[in-house]
A protein has these predicted regions:
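Substrate-binding clefts and catalytic carboxylate motifs of secreted carbohydrate-active enzymes
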Residues: 1-138, 150-154
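Extended low-complexity, serine/threonine- and proline-enriched intrinsically disordered segments
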Residues: 70-76, 159-173
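Solvent-exposed serine/threonine-rich low-complexity stretches and specific carbohydrate-binding patches
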Residues: 76-85, 173-189
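Short, hydrophobic beta-strand segments
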Residues: 91-96, 185-205
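Short beta-strand elements
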Residues: 114-121, 218-228
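Short aromatic-acidic-glycine turn motif
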Residues: 123-127, 165-181
Length: 228
C-alpha cells in the first residue's frame, strides 16, 4: 500500500507503513513485496553504497529476490552465495569501503538477474523524468527529479533545494520528498530527500508541456511532454 497522512507522531507528517511513499516513490518494501508475489526473476540490493565517514565499519547488505540463490560481489570479488527458502531474503555483512557492490540472482543454477550500487562522486546535475504515460489535457502528470554525478551516476544521498518552473501549459499542483518536510504541498521549492523529489503538474491544455528544475551549484534540468 501507500503511505498516507496521519497515524504518526510529530514531526512526521505521514504513516510510513506503505511500500510506496506519499510521493509515489518506491521504497525497499516495494521490492520485498514484488519478490514475494511475482514470478518474473528479480532482485533488489540494499542499501546504497555512499557512506562517507563509515570506512572500515561493518554494514549489513540485503537482497530481496524470488530466485533460488543469490551471490554478492564486492569490487568483483565474491562474498558468498546464499541458498534461499521461499519468502526469505539474502544477507551478508560487509566492511564498508568506497567501491561497488553487486548481487546476482540464480534459478536452477543459471544467472537470471542482477542489481548493483556504486559509490558516487558529489552530485553536479539535476535530471527530470515523467512517470505518467499518455498525458492528456486535464490530467495531472507526475515527475521525478534526481541528480547525477560527473560520471552520470545517480546519487542516492543528494539533498539540494530545488525550484520547479512550468510553462503556460501547466500548473504545479504539488511537490514532495521527506515525511518531515513541513513546506506547503503546493510549494514549487522543496529540499530533495534520499536523492529524489516528486512534482505533480496539472496539464491545462494541449501542446508541449515544459518543466524545469533549478538548484544552486547544479546544472539545471528540463523535460518536455506532448500533452494530447
Amino acid at each position: 500500500g501507500f503511505d498516507h497522512r496521519g497515524e504518526t507522531v510529530w514531526p512526521r507528517l505521514s504513516s510510513c507503513s506503505g511500500a510506496i511513499d506519499m510521493f509515489l516513490l518506491k521504497k525497499d518494501a516495494f521490492w520485498h513485496n514484488k519478490a514475494l508475489w511475482t514470478r518474473e526473476p528479480m532482485i533488489h540490493l540494499l542499501p546504497h553504497w555512499n557512506h562517507p565517514g563509515h570506512e572500515g565499519e561493518i554494514i549489513k547488505v540485503w537482497a530481496y529476490t524470488n530466485c533460488d540463490s543469490a551471490e554478492l560481489f564486492v569490487d568483483g570479488v565474491s562474498r558468498g552465495k546464499v541458498e534461499l527458502q521461499p519468502h526469505d531474503h539474502a544477507a551478508w555483512e560487509v566492511e564498508y569501503h568506497p567501491g561497488k557492490i553487486e548481487v546476482v540472482g540464480y534459478k536452477d543454477g543459471r544467472e537470471c538477474c542482477r542489481d548493483a550500487h556504486e559509490t558516487t562522486n558529489a552530485p553536479v546535475k539535476l535530471m527530470l523524468r515523467c512517470e505518467t504515460p499518455d498525458v492528456k489535457a486535464g490530467d495531472s502528470a507526475v515527475f521525478t527529479c534526481y541528480t547525477l554525478d560527473s560520471e552520470g551516476r545517480e546519487v542516492p544521498t543528494a539533498d539540494p533545494t530545488v525550484r520547479f518552473v512550468v510553462n503556460k501549459l501547466g500548473v504545479i499542483s504539488g511537490t514532495g520528498s521527506a515525511v518531515y518536510d513541513h513546506e506547503p504541498v503546493k510549494s514549487n521549492i522543496r529540499r530533495m530527500y534520499a536523492g529524489q523529489i516528486s512534482a505533480a503538474v496539472k496539464c491545462t491544455g494541449k501542446g508541449i508541456l515544459a518543466l524545469y528544475a533549478y538548484a544552486d551549484g547544479f546544472e539545471a534540468a528540463r523535460v518536455y511532454v506532448d500533452v494530447k
